[in-house]
Amino acid sequence: MNQIEPGVQYNYVYEDDEYMIQEEEWDRDLLLDPAWEKQQRKTFTAWCNSHLRKAGTQIENIEEDFRNGLKLMLLLEVISGERLPKPDRGKMRFHKIANVNKALDYIASKGVKLVSIGAEEIVDGNVKMTLGMIWTIILRFAIQDISVEETSAKEGLLLWCQRKTAPYRNVNIQNFHTSWKDGLGLCALIHRHRPDLIDYSKLNKDDPIGNINLAMEIAEKHLDIPKMLDAEDIVNTPKPDERAIMTYVSCFYHAFAGAEQAETAANRICKVLAVNQENERLMEEYERLASELLEWIRRTIPWLENRTPEKTMQAMQKKLEDFRDYRRKHKPPKVQEKCQLEINFNTLQTKLRISNRPAFMPSEGKMVSDIAGAWQRLEQAEKGYEEWLLNEIRRLERVEHLAEKFRQKASTHETWAYGKEQILLQKDYESSTLTEVRALLRKHEAFESDLAAHQDRVEQIAAIAQELNELDYHDAVNVNDRCQKICDQWDRLGTLTQKRREALERTEKLLETIDQLHLEFAKRAAPFNNWMEGAMEDLQDMFIVHSIEEIQSLITAHEQFKATLPEADGERQSILAIQNEVEKVIQSYSIRISSSNPYSTVTVDEIRSKWDKVKQLVPIRDQSLQEELARQHANERLRRQFAAQANAIGPWIQNKMEEIARSSIQITGALEDQMNQLKQYEHNIINYKNNIDKLEGDHQLIQEALVFDNKHTNYTMEHIRVGWELLLTTIARTINEVETQILTRDAKGITQEQMNEFRASFNHFDRRKNGLMDHEDFRACLISMGYDLGEAEFARIMTLVDPNGQGTVTFQSFIDFMTRETADTDTAEQVIASFRILASDKPYILAEELRRELPPDQAQYCIKRMPAYSGPGSVPGALDYTAFSSALYGESDL
């Protein structure tokens, strides 16, 4: 077997087409590139399988499956559609070589000269030789026949691709390698021929692998083109294999070119059929139009020949209008149809003659001459029809005018007379008031005048009916019947009018009598009703009294009211008698009117009901007044009981307040003696609490009884409560002040004599004796004690004794100031010096030093309130004791 050395290349030459001579980039470089070899192996395998599957087989390994020559021969038979010589079935090497040679001989018979490709290399599985052989087959059977504008093979296929993809953005096909790397070219080919399979607008040029895979998947699924390329190989190879791409793209050409050829053949057939169908359509259209036109003529002629006169003007006018519509609307389109029918007939005959078709022969009776004859008969029937219509209309016009005049007058009279009989038959006066009856009588007089005015119209109606009978009006029977009904009704209206007048006059006299009785009733019932309403209001009036005298006055007034009841009852009976007389008259003459009084809104039932109500309220009022009298007696007892206690408690509280005040300002004796005296006062006050509680109980009873005044005492419970609470507050405050004075005296080293002197000075300048000095009193006090004060110094002292700026100085503030002025006190500097000792002369102190030197609670107090130290030499956790000490004495903003 001959081996192909690395530098050896195979060649193939077509006898008839020199463009197939090998090229350097197609043979030498391609077969030496492993990447290209991989692409060719996959593409050629897929291409072979796309044809072998038609024979129910396929290959897996291109260099192995063609070694025995059997599938190679089968591939050529499927591609060419021709039968090759019968293969050898042996499995020996020479059998395989013989089969491969048969295949190569067949290729050579198609005008392809195989150079350097021998059967032995194929049988030995030489990959490069096998790929070269398959490429030769692809060129001959898949690419050679491609021709676009006299170009062939590769150039033709490239030109076809360029034209198909020219309209697409980002697609520029210049070769069969790099121009296809982004996949948009394949997608554009599919979209150009099958836009339903792919949405080109959604493709992304930056996704070449996705584009290639999408195109191959759609081609495999919808175009029956198997996947022949590997998207990653195409994208990742600088220059993809040209043969592989040409092979795959040629499949698109054959898939779409076959469809175009079929479309061309179908268009040719459709064109021929369209001409024939158009001729048939014109024939059918002629037959249809001719039939419709002849049918219209057949229906119209009898209508035009009909001269039967109508009985009414409207019917004749309808005939005239129909004829005018015929001339204006119906006939012109038919004239156009007749003309168009002749044109269509001539056009059809011309088309048939040009297209070598036999002449058109309409069905029997539908020739152009038949249509012309029918049209002539139509125009003959049309003559004179309009003149006959106008004469008949003039004849009916006079009769119709009289008939319309009769109808108008009859309708006017009937409209006027409608409901008149029912009105005259009404007995509405039987249930009407006098005013309403008088109005009905005046209304009836107006009707009688109207009735007389309509006499002329009735006579005119009868005269017109007579004339229509003489003119032999077609509807004379109905006219006579209507006229007779009008005359009969007229006679009845005259009779009913006279009877109604008599009834109205009789009813008027009866109602005048009733009206006088109603007026008398109204004059007497209204005052009596007002009296009863006032009485009921007084009897139900809610009285509010606060003394026995007030309730006694109400009882006296009620007794006086009861004395007037017999006289009122007599008036009530007189009023009821008037109403009874009214009802007697109504029943005697069967007058169906309401017994209600038009002059009064007061009814008999209302009078009876209110009188009964008055009689019921009198004893109820008696009982309420007596109960209130008893309640006022009980309230008076409560007032006296409360007053007795309040008049004793009030002065007692006042006395105790005065005793405490005197004790608080005394300047003799020791503070301890003063404290003992105040404690005794406090004990006595607490023991007096039972009297306050008892008074509270009596006050609760008074409140429950709704007693709001008490003339027996000037003390109210609120006064007692305020005095008692003030007493408790005063004794507690006074005791606290003495305790504070003792504490201050002991803490500051003040002697009792000094304390007494301070008290004497404060009491002297406490001009209002309320335990407070204002600014001027305080200044005078200081001056009396030897202080020579300027404004600035006095202002400083005031901030000490009146820190809240209330404008007053208490005794305790005065004592604190005087003790600071006379005693030895600690200062912020002393406290800072003490903290500096604990901190070992550092400007800051640590928390552990505070916990070590101070009690736990005081150490925690300092740690919580001391600010952090941020001065020189600061360490983490350093605390500023200087700022803290200044804050203790009000010398800092902390």
Curated annotation (Swiss-Prot):
Record Pfam families: CH (PF00307), EF-hand_7 (PF13499), EFhand_Ca_insen (PF08726), Spectrin (PF00435)
Residues the record lists as binding Ca(2+) 2: D802, N804, T808
Alphabetized GO MF terms: actin filament binding; calcium ion binding; channel activator activity; FATZ binding; identical protein binding; LIM domain binding; phosphatidylinositol-4,5-bisphosphate binding; titin binding
Primary location class: cytoplasm
Residues bearing PTM Phosphothreonine: T237
Job description of the protein: F-actin cross-linking protein which is thought to anchor actin to a variety of intracellular structures. This is a bundling protein.
Post-translational modification: Ubiquitinated by FBXL22, leading to proteasomal degradation.
Domain of life where this protein originates: Eukaryota
Example of a GO cellular component annotation carried by this entry: filopodium
Domain (Calponin-homology (CH)) ranges: 38-142, 151-257
Positions contributing to Ca(2+) 1 binding: D766, N770, D777
Record PANTHER family: SPECTRIN/FILAMIN RELATED CYTOSKELETAL PROTEIN (PTHR11915)
Record domain EF-hand: where: 753-788, 789-824
Family: Belongs to the alpha-actinin family.
Native species: Bos taurus (Bovine)
Region (Actin-binding): 1-254
Subcellular location: Cytoplasm, Myofibril, Sarcomere, Z line
Spectrin repeat residues: 281-391, 401-506, 516-627, 637-740
Subunit structure: Homodimer; antiparallel. Also forms heterodimers with ACTN3. Interacts with ADAM12, MYOZ1, MYOZ2 and MYOZ3. Interacts via its C-terminal region with the LDB3 PDZ domain. Interacts with XIRP2. Interacts with DST (via N-terminus). Interacts with PARVB. Interacts with SYNPO2.
Name used for this protein in its record: Alpha-actinin-2
Lineage: Eukaryota, Metazoa, Chordata, Craniata, Vertebrata
InterPro entries recorded: Actinin_actin-bd_CS (IPR001589), CH_dom (IPR001715), CH_dom_sf (IPR036872), EF-hand-dom_pair (IPR011992), EF-hand_Ca_insen (IPR014837), EF_hand_dom (IPR002048), Spectrin/alpha-actinin (IPR018159), Spectrin_repeat (IPR002017)
Transmembrane feature ranges: none
GO biological process, one term: positive regulation of endocytic recycling
Keywords: Actin-binding, Calcium, Cytoplasm, Metal-binding, Phosphoprotein, Repeat, Ubl conjugation
